[in-house]
Amino acid sequence: LRRECDALNPVFFHYITARTPYVALKYAMTADGKLAARTGRSQWITGETARAHVHSLRSRYRAILVGVGTVLADDPLLNCRMEGGRDPLRVVLDSRLRTPLSARVCRTAQTQKTIFVCAVENAQKRAQLQALGAEVLCLGGADGRVDWVALMRELGAREIDSVLIEGGAEVQYSADRK
């Protein structure tokens, strides 16, 4: 009976018991197991139905998380394009704050809450991102990368109950390890 109850609302039950967000990993892959074209160039590998489902997920999850690689490759907005949908908090893992200030996640940070999470402090870039309306958290781990456990605790403390990871292979791999 407990499993059946938990299955009714996994986000709520996870958040209430762990005080960290429920995390879901969203990715698409080609028939040969790739996440992008052979050239390394990212491209749509799904159809309209799958893309509509992604926007439904973005509306339901409180935060969407990607890595700097996705920002550099795709320059995404990370918003919800579904009518009546809610834009999620954007969380960008960027260990060394390499995201260009011209990126769409930076240019739209005044209108859609955005948090950059770094592992190495860069006061100048922090100030530039903050001037654009973004928040910067420095949560470096012993390995020089973002500390996932600290990040999940921080998001939980901010009452972010769910995170949709849409990052590329590196973010997926590091999330899976934690």
Summary of predicted features, one role per range:
Residues 165:
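Gly/Thr-rich phosphate-binding loop signature of adenosyl cofactor/nucleotide-binding cores
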Residues 1-10:
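Active-site loop-to-helix "anion-binding N-cap" substructures in soluble metabolic enzymes
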Residues 177-178:
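Short glycine/threonine-rich loop-to-helix capping motif typified by GTGT followed
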Residues 11-31, 35-161, 170-173:
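Active-site ligand-binding patch in enzyme domains
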